[in-house]
Structure formats: structure tokens, C-alpha cells
Amino acid sequence: MFLDALEFFCCYYIKSVYSFFVNYVPDKWVVVKIEGKNVPLTYKVFGCWYGGYLGSNSWKLNSGIRKVSKGEDSWLFEGFSGSIYKGFNSNYGMHMYGSGVLNDIINKSEEVGVKVEIMPEHTNWLDLSYE
């Protein structure tokens, strides 16, 4: 009985602390690769959120991925700013609004010699170099 209570407490505590440090959990997300003549190779999380009935859809591009860790059904991306994005495996992709915004970013970046590319869904994010 005591061990069951201790195990419950430890699991609950760890999940609470873990959740405390995650800043963003997008409804949809992709990783983009950015590089150019004067732009060092950088990977960033592009997150999309549904607005719901009275809200509006939104998006956010993180500061650049510094570190990645793998969860059971998700990935954690730590940005250069210190923020942490949690991307669930089943949510890789974008909603229509986010897709339009990112395509606009890709097109405008090309005009100034910067290549922005959406990474494939099944990329092993642990295999990439981030620094």
C-alpha cells in the first residue's frame, strides 16, 4: 500500500514538474530548416493553434531549436530563448491558415536568398545537429 502511494506521488510529481516547463503545445506543428548565404543553418518549430468558436487561428515560430528530447508519443524542442515546445507525433502538419502563413514566409525568404524548407514528418530529430 505504501509503495503504491509512493509510486503514485512520484509519477504525479514528475508529470507536474515536466508540464510546468513546457511552454507551448501546438495543435499542429512542423520543423523548418532555414539556411542562406548570410544565415547559418537553423531548425525552427512552426506551431499552429486552432482558434475555436470565438477565437482565431494563430501560429508561432520558435527562436531556433537548441536541444531535442524524445517522449513516448511526442518530441520536446528547447529553443535558444529557453522556451520548450511539445509536438505530438500525431499532430505533425499545419492547418490551412498556418500553411498559408508558412508558404508566404517561404516565398518571401526566397526573394532575399534564404531557403526555408519543411522537414519530413518522420525525421529523427535526434539525428540533426542544432548548434
What are these regions (language model features)?
Residues F2-L76, S83-E131:
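Cysteine-centric segments in proteins
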